[in-house]
Curated annotation (Swiss-Prot):
<keyword id="KW-0689">Ribosomal protein</keyword>
<dbReference type="Pfam" id="PF01780">
    <property type="entry name" value="Ribosomal_L37ae"/>
</dbReference>
<dbReference type="InterPro" id="IPR011332">
    <property type="entry name" value="Ribosomal_zn-bd"/>
</dbReference>
<dbReference type="InterPro" id="IPR050522">
    <property type="entry name" value="Ribosomal_protein_eL43"/>
</dbReference>
<protein>
    <recommendedName>
        <fullName>Large ribosomal subunit protein eL43</fullName>
    </recommendedName>
</protein>
<dbReference type="GO" id="GO:0006412">
    <property type="term" value="P:translation"/>
</dbReference>
<keyword id="KW-0687">Ribonucleoprotein</keyword>
<dbReference type="InterPro" id="IPR011331">
    <property type="entry name" value="Ribosomal_eL37/eL43"/>
</dbReference>
<keyword id="KW-0863">Zinc-finger</keyword>
<keyword id="KW-0694">RNA-binding</keyword>
<dbReference type="GO" id="GO:0005840">
    <property type="term" value="C:ribosome"/>
</dbReference>
<dbReference type="GO" id="GO:0070180">
    <property type="term" value="F:large ribosomal subunit rRNA binding"/>
</dbReference>
<dbReference type="GO" id="GO:1990904">
    <property type="term" value="C:ribonucleoprotein complex"/>
</dbReference>
<comment type="similarity">
    <text>Belongs to the eukaryotic ribosomal protein eL43 family.</text>
</comment>
<dbReference type="GO" id="GO:0003735">
    <property type="term" value="F:structural constituent of ribosome"/>
</dbReference>
<dbReference type="InterPro" id="IPR002674">
    <property type="entry name" value="Ribosomal_eL43"/>
</dbReference>
<feature type="zinc finger region" description="C4-type">
    <location>
        <begin position="38"/>
        <end position="59"/>
    </location>
</feature>
Length: 86
């Protein structure tokens, strides 16, 4: 319940907020709910526990990341800068 063909999981909002925003919410939620690559073991087994907290189902590594994705664009830049300084 709460799903539609056009907007998937954002169907819970019904006709509210407009189609464009509901499609954007559905896209973000789809990316968030898929499995991501673990930075420790490299397996595609990272799931979101709560806002900004991610855990690997394989090795059990828990780490902080973005609210909707484990690695944010700003985090990638920061990692690249610190790696180049070292």
């Amino acid at each position: 319940m709460g799903r539609t063909t056009k907007v998937g999981s954002a169907g819970r909002f019904g006709p509210r907020y407009g189609l464009k925003i509901r499609r954007r919410v559905a896209a973000v939620e789809a990316k968030m709910k898929q499995k991501h690559i673990c930075p420790v073991c490299g397996r595609k087994a990272v799931r979101r526990i709560s806002t900004g907290i991610w855990q690997c189902q394989k090795c059990g590594a828990t780490f902080a990341g973005g609210a909707y994705l484990p690695v944010t664009p700003a985090g990638k830049v920061a990692k690249r800068v610190t790696a180049s300084k070292a």
